[in-house]
């Protein structure tokens, strides 16, 4: 488990453990497309928080008792056309949009974020990294707005460490719409350095404004490129900083 000391370094505390919690009465659907590869990770991370999560094949539709939705990472439909474009037109995404309109929490992670943008759940788009390379590394994120369901476990300005793994993670949006996002406090996370400075060097993919995650029109809808489910398990992951994002489902 990563912990803070006085100078802000997150070291390892081998004496700290977070055993699985008692399962609560919440059913979270983790939508699985052909090419998804983070669905099992998401289910395990949520289950460790005591959340009743299950993988749902996209052709089967959402269970009637769905109280939360995760669209996980991967390479849905091989990223043909562009990342997330084909999955966004899957019939299950109509149900996801309807659920989002009803206030059901919806989280898109990595490829799920790309799908969410393509499906109109959030503005903007994710395109090829500025490096033109697949980026797989831990990054620092700065919490921009702590007054949301997804960031309530953090403090505004807090720095967390969460991994990325993407080739098309560069967030792009028209300047006027970006200004609206900022004015409406819909930017959740920005890439930063270990001291919280938002710089070009700390931007792994060239995202506009170093944006790593945003809200939809409703604060119950969020997308982000980093993987909170890969920063949630103390006996497996280098960081557990992603747990706070997933706690909205518990």
Locate the predicted segments by residue.
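C-terminal and late-domain segments of enzyme folds
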Residues: 151-250
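Short acidic/polar capping segments at secondary-structure boundaries
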Residues: 112-114, 121-122, 132-133, 145-148, ...
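Conformational gate/switch positions in structured elements
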Residues: 74, 111-112, 167, 228
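Alpha/beta-hydrolase-fold enzymes
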Residues: 127-158, 164-165
């Amino acid at each position: 488990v990563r912990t803070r000391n006085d100078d802000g370094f997150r070291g390892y505390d081998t004496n700290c453990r977070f055993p699985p919690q008692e399962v609560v009465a919440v059913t979270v659907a983790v939508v699985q497309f052909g090419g998804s590869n983070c669905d099992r990770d998401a289910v395990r991370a949520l289950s460790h928080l005591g959340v009743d999560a299950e993988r749902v094949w996209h052709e089967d539709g959402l269970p009637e008792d769905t109280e939360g939705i995760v669209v996980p990472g991967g390479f849905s439909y091989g990223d043909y056309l562009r990342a997330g474009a084909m999955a966004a037109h899957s019939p299950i995404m109509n149900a996801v949009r309807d659920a989002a309109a009803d206030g059901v929490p919806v989280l898109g992670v990595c490829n799920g974020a790309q799908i969410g943008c393509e499906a109109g759940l959030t503005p903007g788009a994710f395109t090829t990294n500025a490096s033109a390379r697949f980026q797989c590394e831990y990054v620092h994120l700065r919490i921009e707005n702590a007054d949301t369901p997804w960031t309530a476990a953090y403090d505004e300005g807090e720095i967390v460490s969460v991994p990325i793994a993407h080739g098309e993670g560069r967030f792009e949006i028209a300047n006027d719409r970006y200004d609206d996002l900022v004015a409406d406090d819909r930017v959740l996370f920005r890439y930063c350095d270990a001291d919280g400075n938002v710089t070009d060097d700390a931007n792994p993919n060239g995202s506009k404004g170093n944006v790593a995650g945003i809200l939809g029109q409703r604060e119950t809808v969020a997308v982000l490129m980093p993987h909170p489910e890969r920063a949630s398990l103390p006996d497996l992951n280098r960081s557990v900083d992603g747990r706070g994002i997933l706690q909205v489902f518990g």
